Amino acid sequence: MARIAGVNIPTNKRVVIALQYIHGIGKKFAQEIVDKVGIPAERRVNQLTDAEVLQIRETIDRDYQVEGDLRREVSMNIKRLMDLGCYRGLRHRRSLPVRGQRTHTNARTRKGPAKSIAGKKK
């Protein structure tokens, strides 16, 4: 198993697919990385040489923000919104949907399990 950006990527998959196991790399960035390094699209991870793995690792470290750094940046952005006290920050603080979805019904994923109300029966 090749270890790139602190993630063990599966060896039997194509490189483009395997790179998507890294947080912050999707289809587009995986294809970009493979094109930059010059690896054929059908090549599998177990067929990569150590030099190619090193090239991939260096490309990701140099050009992309992945894993812990990306998670940290996202959480800092949310924290900044909450500290500002803007509408989006208040919605995050109250664990409600941020992007304008309705909350009278639905929004259970964001709000958590429904709280039962005593005496409310039909």
Curated annotation (Swiss-Prot):
Keyword set, alphabetical order: Ribonucleoprotein, Ribosomal protein, RNA-binding, rRNA-binding, tRNA-binding
Record GO cellular component, one term: small ribosomal subunit
Keyword presence, Ribonucleoprotein: yes
Single GO term (MF): tRNA binding
Cited Pfam families: Ribosomal_S13
GO BP annotations, alphabetical order: translation
UniProt KW Glycosyltransferase keyword: no
Disordered: region residues: 95-122
Subunit comment: Part of the 30S ribosomal subunit. Forms a loose heterodimer with protein S19. Forms two bridges to the 50S subunit in the 70S ribosome.
Functional summary from the UniProt entry: Located at the top of the head of the 30S subunit, it contacts several helices of the 16S rRNA. In the 70S ribosome it contacts the 23S rRNA (bridge B1a) and protein L5 of the 50S subunit (bridge B1b), connecting the 2 subunits; these bridges are implicated in subunit movement. Contacts the tRNAs in the A and P-sites.
Family according to the record: Belongs to the universal ribosomal protein uS13 family.
Designated name of the protein: Small ribosomal subunit protein uS13
Lineage: Bacteria, Pseudomonadati, Pseudomonadota, Alphaproteobacteria, Hyphomicrobiales
